[in-house]
Amino acid sequence: MKRVVLLAALAATTVVAQSTQNRVLRVEGAPRGDLRSGPLTYTGNPVNATVSSLKLKAAQAVVSAPAGQTLAQAEGKRTGVFTGNVLVTRGRLTAKGEKLAYSEATGQGVLSGNPSATFVPEDKSNGDTVSISAGQMSLDVDNNVSTSTGSVRLTNGNQSGRAEKLIFDEDQELAQLTGNPTLTRAAKGNQKELTITGQEVRARTAEKTLYVRGGVRLVQGTLTTTGNAVYYDDKKNVAYVVGNAVSVDSKTKSRLASNILEQRTDIARVREVASFKIPTEQFNLRGEK
């Protein structure tokens, strides 16, 4: 038993050590400042730096150690502040802003100053670029996840979303919007604009599917459909409203109520269906089951 506990402890220690090493900031160039205790100031056109899979460029970078520690002693606890035309790249993600404050201790880089980001599809000939803007963006170097807060706007082809918070998983191409989220699918041809609201929106950006839950409301032309949750497939032009589903047409005064309603968004038609199970497992965030 002691051996098992010891092995588990060693494994945990190894994971922590690897995580700490992955968070170490590397800045290129010859800095100004106290080389032993810092802070060190780097300037260039631009300054280049890396941390884990993140590549950073900026007009200036300042690296500091906690008070009372040398830069060498503080490796894994230092901070780096990048200012002026900050550019961050990681795989298919590119983010921009005026300032990025990075902490080796947390592995978080916080981007501010009108931050924005784009995430290009793996197959550019068969997909749309995801664009994000917010008041602040936090990039996690331990995994390919970013968190945006404050007047968040996300666009993905003809879909656009607004919320107060967005978590975007680059590996899963999965977005979670909370804080009064609203999703809009732009009108196209005879297809009228569709607006979906609820307490939480999850979107698979490559597949163009949505899972919205918590007092959902779909508005399209004169049709308003409400329920507990909705699954929407943009490519198939169909939405399934599940749980206490009610659809009302303000023009014809018709009303349809059922446990499950299917709404064809291309022809604005609603009908009852006997069964439909939302594939919620497709929208699980990291660590969720």
Regions found by a protein language model. Name each.
Residues 2-7:
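Sec-dependent signal peptide recognition
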Residues 8-17:
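Hydrophobic h-region of N-terminal signal peptides that target proteins for export
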Residues 17-289:
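N-terminal amphipathic/hydrophobic interface segments
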